[in-house]
């Protein structure tokens, strides 16, 4: 396995701390014979534990090894995958490196674990290759991510070679995107700097609800204006920031969440930002401005007191500072205070 992972080029950014690279290191030591059996088994079980933990988090089932490899491909943001997200399969020398990596992943998909299991007297790899997950509520894991990754895994299983796998994966990138923005609908600010990736401030919201505009009775003209504005936005046409105002319980927040569900498949994403997080708006915009999605920055129950100054950060984004708000983002806010207009 180490001989395979060491040759990765495009997907080398998967990282040495990943399950894949940890297992590759274990298999390298196994191949040399320079190991303590009990210690090696312990290290293998550590990675199996990590695999089970990830699989539970994302609701994976059946072949967890294949699902994990598909997950790596779906989440790996690099120059090749980000370009594929925008244009799909494309001409260029980089494709030779990509196909080389896909040939490696194809071998990893077909990897034979029987030798190490026989030598160490374990069967954990056989178990995860034929896994039956406990039925879980969809509230426990992100169903959207789970279904996409498992379908990608199934499609790769059927690929004959790296060229076919190249088409499958690049089509996936073009259809769904790559990384957290490709696989998730909604996001929030992550205040824990220890869990942030470099240059990233947003984390996925894994449960967003399945509300629909049809669930709201009345307000037909308002809903139609919201639909028309959002539809223009996702199509790259001129659209406006939106303020929904009215009494509590009139469906303002539900309308915006329903809009996300309606246009998610067309590339719409939503970022929930609270008033105390307005200072982070410029950082948020820096993270999303070059991505091939349309982002609604969602502010719920917006209001300001006379002594509060957070509105200045919002005003700078709307009015435009040195770095203007990019064309792929709009602000949708709700409030019970009409004077905010």
Language model features by range: what are they?
Residues 300-302:
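Walker B catalytic acidic pair
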Residues 220-235:
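Pre-Walker A adenine-sensing motif
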Residues 241-272, 283-289:
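Walker A/P-loop
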Residues 286-290, 305-341:
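Conserved catalytic/switch belt of AAA+ P-loop NTPases
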Residues 156, 201-224:
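Dynamic helix-loop-helix/coil hinge segments at AAA+ ATPase domain boundaries and subdomain interfaces
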Residues 204-207, 231-239:
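Phosphate-binding P-loop
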Residues 133-202:
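Interdomain "pre-motor" coupling segment immediately N-terminal to P-loop NTPase/helicase cores
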Residues 1-157:
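Intrinsically disordered, low-complexity N-terminal extensions of AAA+/P-loop NTPases
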């Amino acid at each position: 396995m180490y001989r395979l992972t060491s040759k990765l080029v495009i997907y080398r950014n998967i990282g040495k701390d990943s399950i894949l690279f940890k297992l590759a290191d274990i298999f390298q030591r196994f191949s040399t014979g320079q190991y303590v059996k009990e210690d090696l088994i312990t290290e293998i079980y550590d990675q199996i534990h990590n695999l089970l933990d990830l699989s539970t988090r994302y609701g994976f089932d059946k072949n967890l090894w294949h699902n994990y490899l598909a997950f790596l491909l779906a989440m790996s943001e690099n120059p090749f995958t980000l370009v594929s997200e925008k244009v799909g399969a494309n001409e260029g020398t980089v494709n030779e490196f990509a196909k080389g990596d896909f040939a490696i992943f194809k071998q990893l998909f077909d990897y034979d674990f029987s030798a190490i299991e026989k030598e160490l007297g374990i069967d954990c790899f056989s178990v995860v290759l034929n896994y039956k997950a406990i039925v879980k509520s969809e509230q426990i894991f992100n169903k959207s991510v789970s279904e996409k990754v498992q379908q990608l895994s199934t499609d790769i299983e059927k690929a004959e070679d790296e060229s076919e796998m190249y088409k499958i994966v690049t089509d996936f990138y073009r259809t769904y995107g790559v990384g957290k923005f490709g696989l998730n609908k909604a996001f929030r600010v992550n205040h824990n700097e220890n869990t942030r990736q470099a240059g990233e401030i947003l984390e996925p919201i894994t449960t967003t609800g399945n509300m629909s505009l049809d669930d709201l009775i009345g307000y037909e003209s308002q809903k139609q204006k919201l639909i028309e504005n959002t539809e223009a936005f996702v199509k790259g046409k001129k659209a406006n920031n939106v303020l929904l105002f009215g009494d509590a319980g009139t469906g303002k927040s539900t309308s915006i969440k329903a809009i996300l569900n309606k246009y998610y498949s067309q590339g719409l994403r939503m970022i929930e930002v609270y008033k105390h997080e307005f200072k982070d708006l410029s950082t948020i915009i820096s993270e999303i401005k070059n991505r091939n999605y349309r982002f609604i920055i969602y502010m719920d129950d917006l209001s300001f007191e006379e002594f509060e100054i957070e509105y200045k950060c919002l005003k700078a984004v709307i009015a435009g500072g040195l770095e203007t708000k990019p064309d792929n983002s709009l602000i949708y806010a709700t409030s019970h205070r009409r004077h905010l207009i």
